[in-house]
Amino acid sequence: MHHPSRRQLLKVAAACGSVGALGLSAPAIGQGLTKVTFTTSWIPEGPNLFAYVARDKGFWKKNGLDVSVARGSGSGAAAQAVGAGTFMFGMGATPTVIIQAAKGLPITCIGQINYDALMGIGVPANSPITKAKDLEGKKLGASVSSGEYPFLPLYAQKAGFDLSKVQLVQLDSKVRDRSLTERLVDAVAAFGSSTIPSLASTGSDVRFLLFKDAGVEFYGQSLTTQPARVKSEPAVCQAFVSGAMEAIRFIMTEPDEALDIFLKANDEVSMTSSGKEYARIGLGLANLTNLVPEVLQNGLGWADPAKVKAQSELILQYAAGQGAKMPDLAQLFTNQFVGKIKFTDAELAKARKSVEPFRKYVA
């Protein structure tokens, strides 16, 4: 029988010591990394950039996980895939997840990725439209299939303008942004998180009047899993959320390095002439939406139960459709795994400085 030499044993001990220094949990050392499947809600872009950083910078590995990242084809499809158990974890637009839950999908939001869906009205940067009232008498491009469309009447009511005096131009969402740059319409109803990077990265300056500023507020995107997993595998859920939130803190304080990591992981983005700028602006906007009281007071990922209730009630009233029922919000949202990752004063200062160039788009 072969007996290991003292030198070999010392090498093993040193290796274990270096792993321990990385902060890996005992199960990760003893049993290897736990394999986890995760789907984003869309193609690689700013709002899901954190996932590639969490994977490739080692934040998930540090928490004992080997996470595969799949690209999604929309928040609705991503939510359904998670609810069905096709993926262990996912992400999606929070309003869409609430709608799916209201229709009976078993799903739980386990951490906020960002805090504003940036629903609003996009106009050229030099447009004379500076407030919602200015939309009266103008052409507003809108797509009935887009998530913000059902809330236009509520926005008009809250922002103090007469929607009947606005000329609504129905557009396919694929040509909506282009219609604005070609001045076929004066403004568009859209998600700023998508439209702003799309237009600004190709040289078309744009700014948004946000629904949020009129009191119509919705969270941006949530991490999701199945309710059963929260109960059966809380340690895996905790490791997944912790790694994601550490990555979000990193992309907010070191956005340039984060962007480099993302581009190396997604060649198709870096190969296009506007791809890097598209990702940079998308990341900046996502980071901007995370500098909110929820994060500053309670840590990254924390969801305000009062806001969740108010947002869910609006979604049920305006967007969920027939047959939808108010989901059990205590099951739909949990803060069990969040609140542990926070900013130091120095990190917060860096994060605030890094988002300044992006405020002009939503000022």
Which residue ranges define each predicted feature?
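N-terminal secretory signal peptides and thylakoid transit peptides that target proteins
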Residues: 1-17
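A glycine-rich, aromatic-flanked flexible loop/lid motif
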Residues: 18, 212-219, 280-286
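N-terminal signal peptide c-region/cleavage motif recognized by signal peptidases
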Residues: 25-27
